[in-house]
């Protein structure tokens, strides 16, 4: 298919955008030329293009992840994937800043500032989060003191009960 021939995208988001572009082609000559200028710059600036492709290769499907989060269906792995993708934004901004065509600089200016969210996820989500919420352990140790205390109680429940039993025996003897 034409999509198969043209699709050199590195992300699921890019593949969806390419498909949309093919299904709804531009009609304005100015917009077509602007897009072609962007493609030409990407083609000619191979070092910048390869760097951009490497960075984009690290970005997960943020649109899908956002949908899962908004519907309450996100897993700890999804949150970890979002965290890693948001952590790539500074690199993506840097890579895009090397381009001059308006369509590419427009992408740069359209990137949202989500540094606070990235920071929150980095401090809250544990590395190598489990696949399911029910497995627990996806909140980073040290993020919440009360949670850490509860984890400690769970991990040391047997010794806590034994100590309590000993104290009660001593008290009642």
What do the predicted segments below correspond to?
Residues 1-173:
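Alpha-helical bundle segments enriched in helix-capping/polar residues
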């Amino acid at each position: 298919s034409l999509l198969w021939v043209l699709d050199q995208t590195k992300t699921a988001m890019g593949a969806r955008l390419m498909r949309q572009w093919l299904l709804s082609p531009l009609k304005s000559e100015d917009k077509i030329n602007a897009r072609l200028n962007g493609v030409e710059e990407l083609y000619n600036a191979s070092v910048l293009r390869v760097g951009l492709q490497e960075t984009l290769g690290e970005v997960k499907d943020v649109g899908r992840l956002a949908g899962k989060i908004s519907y309450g269906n996100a897993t700890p792995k999804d949150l970890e994937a979002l965290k890693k993708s948001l952590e790539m934004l500074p690199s993506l901004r840097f890579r895009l800043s090397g381009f001059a065509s308006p369509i590419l600089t427009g992408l740069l200016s359209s990137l949202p500032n989500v540094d606070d969210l990235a920071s929150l996820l980095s401090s809250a989500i544990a590395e190598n989060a489990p696949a399911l919420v029910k497995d627990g352990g996806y909140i980073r140790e040290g993020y919440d003191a009360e949670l850490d205390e509860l984890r400690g109680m769970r991990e040391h429940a047997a010794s806590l009960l034994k100590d309590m039993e000993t104290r009660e025996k001593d008290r009642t003897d």
